[in-house]
């Protein structure tokens, strides 16, 4: 006989019995002062060790600041005319079964032609194109849910669901430690 590979649940949205209630991202981060990745002055709080974030360049800040909770910047809509029916980004399996990001996601508003606040890069000829990326890249966390798993790349806005739920930045190291519950213990680094 083999053991179970999936551990028994310990938490739930609506706990019963011995289960504990989920801890949301907002609850975990409630005691941290706000930061902003727009400039150096607002990107750290000297009172809390490791509570600092990388500064985003102007384009990345534009993408992040227009990304709603639970959504990816690849789905951002037009900030000029307010048109909100531009196609959103998707992942598709190719004929070999490999998951590939869509090549049809528009970079310009279908109504007014303005560039959308979506991750893009400049080609050698000076034209812009949408960056390659999956639907979890440049994605803002949802404040009312538990945090998604954090990877070693959590300090990059393009990393999987690592944009702060309501501030224009990624998580600080201090916040990542809190989400992983490491800040609940005394460590000497």
PLM feature spans:
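C-terminal target-recognition/interaction regions appended to catalytic cores
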Residues: 43-189
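Flexible, glycine-/basic-rich loop-and-beta segments that form/coincide
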Residues: 1-42
């Amino acid at each position: 006989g083999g053991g179970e590979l999936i551990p028994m649940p310990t938490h739930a949205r609506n706990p019963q019995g011995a289960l504990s209630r989920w801890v949301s991202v907002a609850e975990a981060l409630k005691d941290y002062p706000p930061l902003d990745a727009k400039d150096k002055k607002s990107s750290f709080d000297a009172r809390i060790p490791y509570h600092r974030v990388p500064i985003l360049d102007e384009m990345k800040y534009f993408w992040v600041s227009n990304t709603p909770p639970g959504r990816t910047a690849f789905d951002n809509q037009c900030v000029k005319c307010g048109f909100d029916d531009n196609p959103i980004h998707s992942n598709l399996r190719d004929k070999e079964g490999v998951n590939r990001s869509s090549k049809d996601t528009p970079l310009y508003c279908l109504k007014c032609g303005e560039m959308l606040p979506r991750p893009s890069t400049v080609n050698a000829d000076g034209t812009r194109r949408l960056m390659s990326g999956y639907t979890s890249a440049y994605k803002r966390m949802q404040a009312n849910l538990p945090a998604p798993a954090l990877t070693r790349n959590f300090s990059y806005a393009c990393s999987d669901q690592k944009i702060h739920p309501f501030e224009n930045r990624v998580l600080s190291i201090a916040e990542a430690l809190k989400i992983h519950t490491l800040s609940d213990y005394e460590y000497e680094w």
